[in-house]
């Protein structure tokens, strides 16, 4: 049975007019529809997405629903802008269900303009522990959590924008020699303990490191700026864009601006004093950063709490020698 996707979106977005933490309780059947329909769309599109600018890129959201709505208030609700999200929609925050349902609804409504990559928290072994399973169980059922798992197992893991900006949740892999390898990953798939898929969602850049190192997370690797440079040169790319780590200013460059980390959950978990950021890429691949400050006392967004960072604009010229 098909559901009215516009009505579902309206129900979810209407929350912006109420208290920031107000729950939106869709029916079990509506959520199953969102999962099964978006799953089909994910499978109809490549594992490595080939996208075109202009678009806006967002990092981790982690169940911070009111902050997701603030990002859309600022960047424009779809279809006013094209979006690429880099994963980690669920866990830790209080409203993972609202976050993932709205993102899936937009994916269904605008399949060619709205894109969602898989993060390390879109795997059952992780979101079983860090909050999403408990939220599903408390508000709906374990069965519904399993329906989400079936959908997560089909999400794409990487994207290339205009053949120049390579995007993923985590980072590079020592096993990644050709981008075609990503295309060949068979879905549905769970996360392996090692290898290419694991690294794409788990690895981290590390300052003062040359080559590959052990990751303190106990999974995957860390990599140095030299690894980034060699990879970009080999594949004729200009920039790696990833999420996965809290950064104080919402975005942080690494290795002579050859890699950028974007994190979009301000005041993460209520414990970090970070701002969130969203990266806008225009037709000329000029990247600018929009900063989302923590909402004071969780008020609705005001113009004073969001401002564009003009000084941190990075021009990506379409050449190897960026």
UniProtKB/Swiss-Prot annotation:
Binding of Mn(2+) 1, residues: 60, 62, 88
Renumbered residue ranges of the record's region Disordered: 298-322
Gene source species: Schizosaccharomyces pombe (strain 972 / ATCC 24843)
SUPFAM superfamilies noted in UniProt: Metallo-dependent phosphatases
Active site: 121 (proton donor)
Recorded family membership: Belongs to the PPP phosphatase family. PP-1 subfamily.
Function in brief: Essential role in cell cycle control. PP1 is perhaps required for exit from mitosis.
GO MF: metal ion binding; protein serine/threonine phosphatase activity
Protein name: Serine/threonine-protein phosphatase PP1-2
EC number: 3.1.3.16
Catalytic activity: O-phospho-L-seryl-[protein] + H2O = L-seryl-[protein] + phosphate; O-phospho-L-threonyl-[protein] + H2O = L-threonyl-[protein] + phosphate
Keywords assigned by UniProt, alphabetized: Cell cycle, Cell division, Hydrolase, Manganese, Metal-binding, Mitosis, Protein phosphatase
Enzyme class label: hydrolase
Keyword Disulfide bond attached: no
Cofactor(s) needed: Mn(2+)
A Pfam family assignment: Metallophos
Biological process annotations from GO: cell division; chromosome segregation; positive regulation of establishment of cell polarity regulating cell shape; regulation of mitotic cell cycle; signaling
The gene coding this protein: sds21
CDD domains: MPP_PP1_PPKL (cd07414)
Gene Ontology CC annotations of this record: chromatin; cytoplasm; nucleolus; nucleus; protein phosphatase type 1 complex; PTW/PP1 phosphatase complex
């Amino acid at each position: 049975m098909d559901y009215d996707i516009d009505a579902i979106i309206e129900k979810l977005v209407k929350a912006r007019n109420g208290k920031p933490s107000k729950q939106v309780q869709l029916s079990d059947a509506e959520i199953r529809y969102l999962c099964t329909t978006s799953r089909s769309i994910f499978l109809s599109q490549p594992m490595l997405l080939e996208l075109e600018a202009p678009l806006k890129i967002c990092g981790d959201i982690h169940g911070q629903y009111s902050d997701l709505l603030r990002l859309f208030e600022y960047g424009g609700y779809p279809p006013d802008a094209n979006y690429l999200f880099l994963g980690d929609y669920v866990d830790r925050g209080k409203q993972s269900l609202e976050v993932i349902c709205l993102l899936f609804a937009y994916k269904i409504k605008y399949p060619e303009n709205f894109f969602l990559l898989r993060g390390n928290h879109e795997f059952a072994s992780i979101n079983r522990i860090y909050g999403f399973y408990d939220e599903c169980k408390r508000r709906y059922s374990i069965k519904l959590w399993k329906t989400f798992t079936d959908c997560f197992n089909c999400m794409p893991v990487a994207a290339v924008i205009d053949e120049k900006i390579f995007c993923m949740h985590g980072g590079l892999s020592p096993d990644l020699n050709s981008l075609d390898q990503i295309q060949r990953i068979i879905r549905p798939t769970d996360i392996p303990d090692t290898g290419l898929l694991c690294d794409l969602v788990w690895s981290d850049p590390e300052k003062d490191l040359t080559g590959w190192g052990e990751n303190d997370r106990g999974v995957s690797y860390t990599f140095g700026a030299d690894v980034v440079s060699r990879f970009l040169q080999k594949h004729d790319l200009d920039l790696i864009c990833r999420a996965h780590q809290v950064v104080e200013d919402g975005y942080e460059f690494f290795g002579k601006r050859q890699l950028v980390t974007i994190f979009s959950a301000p005041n993460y978990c209520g414990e970090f004093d970070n701002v969130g950021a969203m990266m806008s890429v225009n037709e000329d691949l000029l990247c600018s950063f929009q900063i989302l400050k923590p909402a004071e006392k969780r008020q609705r967004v005001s113009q004073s709490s969001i401002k564009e960072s003009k000084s941190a604009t990075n021009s990506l010229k379409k050449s190897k020698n960026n």
